[in-house]
């Protein structure tokens, strides 16, 4: 493979000096000895009690190196270092380097057995220990660090054999990092990798006057910066004990008293400072943070209340030695709502690869250059996978490290961290980025730190559970969990709402990162002790319904709650529509009765639902709700809106071009937003977004566009985010702001809607019916503006089956199709109401256009589609099941998203097009295909036979082993339908094989 689209680092400061140093090819020992010769009496290391000079450090290291060399010591021999954090750390490493060995620093808090196993795998013979560790049961030859001796002239002037001669390829360190198994991997660090960081930390070398905090555990690779960056530059190390780090007040005092100017610490410690003492790092010249994704809220607090001169967000896995990317944080990052991990430093090369290894704007980050490790010791298979050797554009071979981190490149070359490959989880068919949940929780302003995780419940039927632990921003007044979840529900889709657990303080592991493993264990321990077991069928006969139902709730919600009150509500306790679907399936299996999703939504308390189950035993409840009178009444809710007295603004005039759009974070909305942003006549676009503030709203918009590979950094010049709610009379805005924006806007595109195929009309009504009225009210306020409303042909319901209608005209009345509507889902019912409501307004002269697309699928050129819509889920499920339900004469109108938006924008460009409805469907009937033909194409696309089954037989097979993709919708598919024939909600678009192959390829990549 040959790489292109590489991201090289900019020309660093001090490049000439670095080049000369590399050209000399001297190892770390000789480079340090240069500093000793230049300034032997300069302070090298200082702590609370004492200090040692460069000359004294040299003398001490020489004596220890001599002891090592008496036993047939060989170059790059691994030497264990088990000492307390402090001066001994520095001396021990220097001694091993002087002897030509490889340092293997161990955390002294580890058990003897763990240390022994690690060093045995490295074939170590020697360990260096201090006085406090000399009595440990470690079966190696121990060399004890004695107190250093006074410096003599002889130590510097005589021809010593130490430091031994090494070069930049010398393996100086072996740093252990956790692996996917219980055995940690030993990462080899070469001298050239350390030198790369020393001279580019991150943008220029340290100054002689700098004092660098040694705050990191020496078994952690960032400690190499603490020690070697100052020593190779003639600067000073200041020791900070762990107990100092745990008390921010004491830490700030030490920074001041020791004159510390540079410190590398973890994001978790900065987060702690933000909530306890934001000024803790204010005396620093440079503060590096890293190890975890940057917390924008915490950074904003520190920048506002007590920033260091430079705050650097640094990135670098151990395999790339300390830092390989870096970014100086500024207030602009806070405004954008995200902090970049920066650009490559020094001679680092960054490459972003898709799953096939090809260059991409978003994908896995590969790192090349001087900092890359020689590999894991004694791990040839892992090295082959993690450190590929590939051809550079110059024709030279180069080694890269595959980080496993998903990143995104901005147009200006900055790189954004998206998440871990292994932090991307799936819950009931949905792909979820845990970082997105953490970011949203932090943006509520209620929490200081958040850790989200997916936990596989050991209890039958519960599946994966989303859990988030959070520390309150104001510990004295912790927020109500229900309040936080309510905010989240306005920001995130239902399947991303976690079970929220408050915790006083985040536990940290030995590397000062959030201990996610410990949090998972904590949750599982609580759940196991409190959850009721799922009842077996025979036992339900002798238990009351409410008790059995409570057991199901506890299992499905994985809620650590031992008892449920009769008034407890399934959805208030955190139940989502996906979990509601699972609950209905469990009820049918356990109680052997038919209960519909509608019954659950109408009776969501444990007491009410238990009564419904008792009533349903021996039969089934009605699954069709006839609310025709309600729907008709709702179509008249906007009749009191005053009709506009003037013609609408021409939104494409030079002095106009200001768009107000809803639903821009949805699939169709994201593509339409992208098209509008590319139009020269469009100057600004204001998007109504469910979010707590503008920054969070902008982040949602960006994530939506990035999800479909549409985002460009220049969009920020045109894009505005207005946090709000469709269901609110003034769209969630202050009335004055509502009026201001109404006069600002030139036109309105309304795509916002609640879409859930399993929920009733009553839950769709606020956003879809009332929201549409509120959008029209906005358009009528101030100057008159056209409303372009994107509906769907689903607004007609299954009219052909019930009314015999063969075709529907664009301007035909919707009233004749009301008879079929009770047999469709709540979303379609809300579409009918909103559509009919707007038709009544159009008859009164309101400037409104209605667009009714057929079934919208992916982009016809790129194949990018929505993996979460019904059609995509059904395709994947049918492929997995190798079967599909027979639905004779089921024809659907397939239209690609790019075609739909082209039609909308073409019509909307005409001033004379308002006042009508438009069907966006294939030009002729020959271009729509039925279910059988669609599945034949699916079989061709995946090169596999897909068999037809009678509908109920297919449902039984689905119930026995439901594919993950269809689990959320299984109860809807299984409900009784009119004449047991029409399976409401199944929609199949027209396809050809080549286009379907594009869609399947995209869906597979999204799974």
Swiss-Prot record:
Q: Which Pfam families match?
A: AMP-binding, NAD_binding_4, PP-binding
Catalytic activities: L-tyrosinal + AMP + diphosphate + NADP(+) = L-tyrosine + ATP + NADPH + H(+)
Which residues are reported to carry the modification O-(pantetheine 4'-phosphoryl)serine?
577
Which PROSITE patterns would you find in this protein's record? AMP_BINDING, CARRIER
Q: Which InterPro entries match?
A: ACP-like_sf (IPR036736), AMP-bd_C_sf (IPR045851), AMP-binding_CS (IPR020845), AMP-dep_synth/lig_dom (IPR000873), ANL_N_sf (IPR042099), Far_NAD-bd (IPR013120), NAD(P)-bd_dom_sf (IPR036291), PP-bd_ACP (IPR009081)
Q: Which Gene3D superfamilies match?
A: 3.30.300.30, ACP-like, N-terminal domain of ligase-like, NAD(P)-binding Rossmann-like Domain
Q: Which GO molecular function entries does the Swiss-Prot or TrEMBL record give?
A: ligase activity; oxidoreductase activity
SUPFAM superfamilies referenced in this protein's UniProt entry, alphabetically: Acetyl-CoA synthetase-like (SSF56801), ACP-like (SSF47336), NAD(P)-binding Rossmann-fold domains (SSF51735)
Please give the superkingdom of this protein's source: Eukaryota
Q: Phenotype upon knockout?
A: Abolishes the production of piperazines and suppresses the formation of sclerotia when lnbA is also disrupted.
Domain named Carrier is located at 540-617
UniProt keywords, alphabetically: Ligase, Multifunctional enzyme, Oxidoreductase, Phosphopantetheine, Phosphoprotein
- Sequence segments annotated as region (Adenylation (A) domain): 35-428
Q: Where is this region: Short-chain dehydrogenase/reductase (R) domain?
A: 659-998
Pathway of this protein? Answer: Secondary metabolite biosynthesis
The answer to whether the entry has keyword Ligase is yes
Q: What is its EC number?
A: 1.2.1.101
Domain notes, please? NRP synthetases are composed of discrete domains (adenylation (A), thiolation (T) or peptidyl carrier protein (PCP) and condensation (C) domains) which when grouped together are referred to as a single module. Each module is responsible for the recognition (via the A domain) and incorporation of a single amino acid into the growing peptide product. Thus, an NRP synthetase is generally composed of one or more modules and can terminate in a thioesterase domain (TE) that releases the newly synthesized peptide from the enzyme.
Regarding protein family, the annotation reads: Belongs to the NRP synthetase family.
Function recorded in the entry:
Non-canonical nonribosomal peptide synthetase; part of the lnb gene cluster that mediates the biosynthesis of diastereomeric piperazines. Lna and lnb clusters encode sets of enzymes that produce overlapping sets of previously undescribed metabolites such as piperazinomycin-like metabolites or morpholine. The lna and lnb biosynthetic pathways appear to be part of a signaling network that controls the formation of sclerotia, a resilient overwintering structure. One primary function of the non-canonical nonribosomal peptide synthetases lnaA and lnbA consists in the reduction of L-tyrosine.
- Name of the protein this chain belongs to: Aldehyde reductase lnbA
Q: Please tell me the species this chain comes from.
A: Aspergillus flavus (strain ATCC 200026 / FGSC A1120 / IAM 13836 / NRRL 3357 / JCM 12722 / SRRC 167)
């Amino acid at each position: 493979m040959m790489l292109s689209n590489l991201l090289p680092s900019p020309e660093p400061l001090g490049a000439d000096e670095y080049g000369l140093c590399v050209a000399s090819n001297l190892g770390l020992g000789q480079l340090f000895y240069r500093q000793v010769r230049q300034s032997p009496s300069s302070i090298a290391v200082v702590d609370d009690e004492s200090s040692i000079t460069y000359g004294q450090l040299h003398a001490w290291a020489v004596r220890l190196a001599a002891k090592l060399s008496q036993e047939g010591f060989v170059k790059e021999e691994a030497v264990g270092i088990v000492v307390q954090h402090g001066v001994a750390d520095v001396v021990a490493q220097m001694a091993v380097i002087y002897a030509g060995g490889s340092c293997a620093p161990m955390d002294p808090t580890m058990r003897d057995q763990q240390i022994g196993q690690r060093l045995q795998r490295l074939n170590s013979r020697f360990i260096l220990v201090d006085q406090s560790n000399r009595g440990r049961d470690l079966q190696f030859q121990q060399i004890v660090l004695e107190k250093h001796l006074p410096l003599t002239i002889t130590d510097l002037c005589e021809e010593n054999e130490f430091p031994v001669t090494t070069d930049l390829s010398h393996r100086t360190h072996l740093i252990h990092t956790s692996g996917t198994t219980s055995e940690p991997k030993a990462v080899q660090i070469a001298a050239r990798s350390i030198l790369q960081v020393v001279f580019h930390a991150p943008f220029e070398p340290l100054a002689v006057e700098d004092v660098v905090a040694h705050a990191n555990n020496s078994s952690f690779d960032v400690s190499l910066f603490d020690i070697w960056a100052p020593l190779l530059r003639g600067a000073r190390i200041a020791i900070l004990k762990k107990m100092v780090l745990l008390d921010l007040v004491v830490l700030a005092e030490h920074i001041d008293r020791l004159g510390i100017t540079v410190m590398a610490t973890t994001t978790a410690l900065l987060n702690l400072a933000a909530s306890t003492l934001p000024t803790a790092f204010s005396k620093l010249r440079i503060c590096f943070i890293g190890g975890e994704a940057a917390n924008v809220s915490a950074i904003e607090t520190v920048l506002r209340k007590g920033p260091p001169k430079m705050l650097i967000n640094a990135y670098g896995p151990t395999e790339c030695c300390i830092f390989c990317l870096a970014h100086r944080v500024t207030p602009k990052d806070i405004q954008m709502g995200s902090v970049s991990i920066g650009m490559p430093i020094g001679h680092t090369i960054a490459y972003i690869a898709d799953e096939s290894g090809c260059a991409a704007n978003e994908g896995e980050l590969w790192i090349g250059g001087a900092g890359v490790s020689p590999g894991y010791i004694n791990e040839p298979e892992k090295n082959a996978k993690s450190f590929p050797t590939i051809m550079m554009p110059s024709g030279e071979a180069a080694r890269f490290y595959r980080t496993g981190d998903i990143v995104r490149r901005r147009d200006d070359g900055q790189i954004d961290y998206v998440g871990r490959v292994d932090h991307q989880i799936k819950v009931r068919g949905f792909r979820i980025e845990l970082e997105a949940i953490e970011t949203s929780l932090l943006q509520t302003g209620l929490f200081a730190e958040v850790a989200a995780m997916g936990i596989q419940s050991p209890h039958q039927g519960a599946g994966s559970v989303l859990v988030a632990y959070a520390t309150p921003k104001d510990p004295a007044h912790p927020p109500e969990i229900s309040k936080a979840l309510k905010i989240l529900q306005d920001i995130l889709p239902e399947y991303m709402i976690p079970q929220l657990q408050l915790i006083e303080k985040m536990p940290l592991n030995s590397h000062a990162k959030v201990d996610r493993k410990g949090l998972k264990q904590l949750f599982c321990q609580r759940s196991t002790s409190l959850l009721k077991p799922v009842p077996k069928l025979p036992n339900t006969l002798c238990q009351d319904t409410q008790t059995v139902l409570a057991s199901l709730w506890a299992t499905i919600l994985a809620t650590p709650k031992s008892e449920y009150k009769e008034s407890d509500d399934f959805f208030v306790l955190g139940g989502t529509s996906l979990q509601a679907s699972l609950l209905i399936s469990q009820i049918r299996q356990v109680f052997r009765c038919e209960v519909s999703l509608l019954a659950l939504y109408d009776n969501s308390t444990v007491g009410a639902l238990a009564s419904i189950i008792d009533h349903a035993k021996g039969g089934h409840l009605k699954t069709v709700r006839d609310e025709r009178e309600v729907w008709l009444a709702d179509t008249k809710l906007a009749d009191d809106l005053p009709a506009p007295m003037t013609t609408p603004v021409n939104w494409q005039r030079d002095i106009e071009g200001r768009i107000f759009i809803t639903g821009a974070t949805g699939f169709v909305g994201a593509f339409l937003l992208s098209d509008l942003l590319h139009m020269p006549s469009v100057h600004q676009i204001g998007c109504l977004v469910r979010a707590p503030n503008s920054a969070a709203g902008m982040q949602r918009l960006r994530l939506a566009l990035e999800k479909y590979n549409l985002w460009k950094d220049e969009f920020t010049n045109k894009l505005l985010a207005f946090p709000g709610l469709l269901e609110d009379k003034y769209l969630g805005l202050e009335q004055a702001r509502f009026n201001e924006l109404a006069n600002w806007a030139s036109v309105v595109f309304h795509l916002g809607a609640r879409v859930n195929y399993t929920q009733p009309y009553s839950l769709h009504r606020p956003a879809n019916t009332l929201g549409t009225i509120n959008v029209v009210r906005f358009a009528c306020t101030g100057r008159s503006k056209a409303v372009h409303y994107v509906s769907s042909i689903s607004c007609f319901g299954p009219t052909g089956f019930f009314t015999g209608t063969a075709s529907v005209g664009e301007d035909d009345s919707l009233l004749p199709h009301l008879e079929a509507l009770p047999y469709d889902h709540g979303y379609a019912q809300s579409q009918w109401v909103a559509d009919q409501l707007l038709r009544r307004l159009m008859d009164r002269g309101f400037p409104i256009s209605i667009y009714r697309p057929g079934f919208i699928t992916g982009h016809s050129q790129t194949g990018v589609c929505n993996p979460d819509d019904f059609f995509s889920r059904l395709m994947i499920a049918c492929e997995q099941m190798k079967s599909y339900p027979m639905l004779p004469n089921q024809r659907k109108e397939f239209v690609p998203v790019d075609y739909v938006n082209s039609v909308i924008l073409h019509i909307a460009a005409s001033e004379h097009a308002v006042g009508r409805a438009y069907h966006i469907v294939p030009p002729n009937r020959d271009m729509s295909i039925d279910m059988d033909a669609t599945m034949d194409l699916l079989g061709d696309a995946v090169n596999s036979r897909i068999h037809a089954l009678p509908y109920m037989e297919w449902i039984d097979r689905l119930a026995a082993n439901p594919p993950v993709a269809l689990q959320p919708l299984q109860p809807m598919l299984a409900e009784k339908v009119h004449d047991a024939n029409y399976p409401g909600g199944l929609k199949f678009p027209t396809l050809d094989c080549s286009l379907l192959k594009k869609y399947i390829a995209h869906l597979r990549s999204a799974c």
